[in-house]
């Protein structure tokens, strides 16, 4: 079956997580992603957080499925020739270098456009234009500068970063959408364009409900936040609210049976207004249906701590899965806190391809996330990540049409690897 992005060729200069997230998603949709790596070194994540000596790390393998790898020294004159030919042969160049790196390589936007007017140049940066645009940014820096950390955690505690990679992977997903949109626009204009996604912008986009709340503060307290019910005044910035729901329906994480020994024996419980009476029945408080302090959503806001304390008395008598089964029958929104171990062993996620087992030639079988987006006419087959330079000769021949002699000349130039040394005279 033809894949959605079949025929699209991506020149991938990305490394670590943000850019590879973007290009891996495009590869899953069928694009031919050519990952350009330094000879003998490659993407730095190949050697980071290694759990097995002398093999590509999971950090690398889980971000570079379905790609081809070519090693290329872009400072080498022959390497520049190869890169020039690749630019002419590809549809999109994706990079997450520091500011100005492409220009210093001799491939400015203007130069690239002169070589291939249809090429889309997509970039991930830490910040957009402004006072911080030259600053180096990593995942947690993006979370802190994008508004996520200041609004995550408990009111009386430190700002916290989330375990989800909303800065790196989140921005990569944003960029992928920009690339696909630019490809579509190119069908109309016939031209390439620059596409940029800044990590600060991406995190702020994912934190938009907190920007919503910042504006609401000008008109009064945020009544769904627990501190309102506790009578604690609000300041001039959105506070950290623990596990309070970010929407209009109050919610909390509550203990379940076994919480004393299981760090994940918890459930998220939302007191949604349409099912309030069912909640009262489940927890054994039928009088709350008509009690003036509890019957109406507005009245309940001042008593949320008491309400959730009572609900927790009930959830502590059930495992998180027992509680979920009971609550789901009454359409009461809830969700168990699932550990990574539980997710890895969840057979339903295996069946949908959300979690996949991949076989790798040097590290063996491992688990990875699959494509989170399912398309009926473009199913995803997750293929292992490439070994360093595994497809170098294949790309030179198939993509650039090089002859055997031309391939040998590139090798001997040192552009792909150290030049072959003649045997020492005896």
Swiss-Prot record:
Pathway(s) the chain acts in: Metabolic intermediate degradation; oxalate degradation; CO(2) and formate from oxalate: step 1/2
Catalytic activity, EC: 2.8.3.16
Matching SUPFAM superfamilies: CoA-transferase family III (CaiB/BaiF)
Reactions catalysed, as given in the entry: formyl-CoA + oxalate = oxalyl-CoA + formate
One matching Pfam family: CoA_transf_3
GO molecular function terms noted in the UniProt entry: formyl-CoA transferase activity
Positions bound to substrate: 247-249
Alphabetically ordered keywords of this record: Transferase
Catalytic machinery residues: 168
List of residues binding CoA: 17-18, 38, 72-75, 96-98, 104, 136-139
GO BP term (any one): oxalate catabolic process
Family matches, as InterPro entries: CoA-transferase_III_domain, CoA-Trfase_fam_III, CoA-Trfase_III_dom3_sf, CoA-Trfase_III_dom_1_sf, Formyl_CoA_transfer
Assembly and oligomerization: Homodimer.
HAMAP family: Formyl_CoA_transfer
Known role: Involved in the catabolism of oxalate and in the adapatation to low pH via the induction of the oxalate-dependent acid tolerance response (ATR). Catalyzes the transfer of the CoA moiety from formyl-CoA to oxalate.
Family stated for the protein in its record: Belongs to the CoA-transferase III family. Frc subfamily.
Protein name per the record: Formyl-CoA:oxalate CoA-transferase
